[in-house]
Amino acid sequence: KTCKTVEQKIFFEKHLIPDVNILLSDHCNLNCASCTNYAPLANKKFTPFEVIEKDIKKLSELAQNKVARIDLMGGEPLLNPEIVEIMWVSRKYFPSTNIAIETNGILLKSMPEEFWQTVKETGIIVRISLYNGINSVDEIKNFAKEKGADFRQNCTVDDWCCQNEHKIVIETNGGCLDWKYYPLDLSGKQDLNYNFENCEQHCCCCLHEGFFYPCTRIAN
């Protein structure tokens, strides 16, 4: 990560790993052509809760609980019927890490009260990606108001340092509106090391079914 402030530099120096994605489902309830996780091509599949818990526990032991941020991802993570249990386990093994659920937001209005109570008690952030024709900043802001939640937009690394205990926080990110163009080289002749070092997401790792990937793409 590029640190723009002294506070950010100190924050990241305290952590062994800047960012880890944990995949809760392979599939999604959208069919985006630009999906970098290839969810539209995936079969309906959820990573078993026991596997996720084992992975999170092992990561906590190896990283000595020094992970700056964890993103609970998919596919669409809210499709996983054990999402509440996964949230509790994530917070159990990473009590001080910034944890967020990355969702397209479609299922949020139908989520049970138990889900929202867990969000509040664990301090896990609900981060909604923006999609044309699916949601908007104003819609998300109004939804956050209905839930009595804090609303954030265009969050920075500084927000990772915040603790969100006993309140609901809803954020937005650019989603498909903010993604860069990722060309596929079918010939396989590109310089892998160069591409990895210059990828804007090169610090974004992925934990999935017993494997720790240095790149989120290859986990899919």
Predicted regions: what they are:
Residues 1-114:
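Conserved alpha-helical substructure of the radical SAM core
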Residues 2-4, 162, 175-177, 198-200, ...:
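Sequence contexts marking disulfide-bonded cysteines in secreted/extracellular proteins
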Residues 108-111, 134-139:
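Short, charged/polar "capping" segments at the starts of alpha-helices
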Residues 120-125, 147-149:
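Glycine-enriched alpha-helix->loop->beta-strand junction motifs that scaffold or abut catalytic
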Residues 123-134, 153-156:
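Non-cysteine beta-strand/loop elements that form the S-adenosyl-L-methionine
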Residues 138-157, 174:
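Basic phosphate/pyrophosphate-binding loop/patch that engages nucleotide-derived ligands
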Residues 160-165, 169-175, 217-220:
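C-terminal accessory region of radical SAM enzymes
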Residues 180-220:
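Accessory C-terminal segments flanking Radical SAM cores
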